[in-house]
């Protein structure tokens, strides 16, 4: 999620209000104090956009490109045809999400599964090979009536303009709403399309989710059928707060291990 509790604790404006990270990263704050809500997310968004990539992103990008080169060395057409064949078999037995087509799923042997909401991975990596499972500050959604629940969000999702910046007062950490943060469909208040605390109205990105599910399913089938292939799960920057991410890696490894065991092989 956006920022850490440690960062928030150092902000004078929040300390004076006796507010912590969970108070601010809550959709109900939009109704309680609109400018404080937009100030918090505006600070995050401005900061994320100003932050340049560290070398870790370039290392991952080089690895991705190396995987592509290796796959192409073995015959790009052959790799695509194997992916297509596995995809078609899973589609035929209805083991893939409905509406997912093979061209909407990356056939690269590489995928980024992240809880980061800064959208930095999408600066360099193909959108089809990134799943931001908690959403992103670059994408906004209609907020509906958060306080009373009297009006559900209209399900409109939109991107912030690339040249947009929040007009943040750093003394109060407040920012006004703007046209860019207003729902273009119904004119209601907007909010980041980010999963927050106590969030019942977040609109999940089913397209990204389904793309990842389809990719993982195809890769698992290819690994099951070809024991010479290897699966690597690289976890970066995880701790006990990110159990959903850790469990996803374990699920993938356990699924492959079970299938190989059934074939009398060892992972």
Task: Describe the role of every protein-language-model region.
Residues 1-267:
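Conserved catalytic alpha/beta core of Sir2/sirtuin-type deacylases, generalized to analogous enzyme cores
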């Amino acid at each position: 999620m956006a920022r850490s509790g440690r960062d928030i604790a150092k902000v004078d404006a929040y300390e004076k209000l006796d507010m912590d990270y969970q108070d601010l990263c809550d959709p109900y704050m939009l109704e309680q104090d609109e400018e404080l809500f937009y100030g918090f997310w505006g600070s995050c968004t401005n900061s994320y956009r100003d932050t340049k990539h560290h070398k870790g992103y370039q290392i991952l990008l080089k690895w991705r490109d190396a995987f592509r080169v290796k796959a192409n060395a073995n015959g790009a057409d052959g790799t695509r045809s194997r992916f297509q064949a596995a995809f078609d078999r899973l589609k035929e037995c209805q083991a893939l999400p409905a509406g997912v087509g093979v061209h909407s799923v990356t056939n690269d042997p590489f995928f980024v599964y992240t809880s980061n909401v800064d959208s930095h991975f999408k600066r360099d990596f193909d959108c089809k090979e990134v799943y931001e499972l908690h959403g992103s500050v670059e994408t906004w959604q209609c907020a509906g009536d958060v306080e009373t629940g009297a009006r559900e969000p209209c399900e409109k999702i939109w991107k912030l303009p690339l040249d947009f910046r929040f007009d943040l007062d750093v003394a109060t950490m407040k920012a006004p709403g703007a046209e860019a943060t207003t729902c273009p469909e119904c004119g209601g208040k907007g909010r980041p399309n980010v999963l927050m605390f106590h969030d019942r109205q977040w609109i999940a990105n089913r397209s990204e989710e389904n793309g990842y599910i389809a990719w993982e399913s195809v890769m698992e089938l290819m690994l099951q059928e070809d024991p010479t292939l290897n699966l690597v799960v690289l976890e970066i920057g995880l701790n006990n707060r990110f159990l959903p991410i850790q469990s996803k890696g374990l699920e993938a490894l356990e699924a492959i291990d079970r299938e190989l065991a059934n074939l009398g092989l060892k992972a």
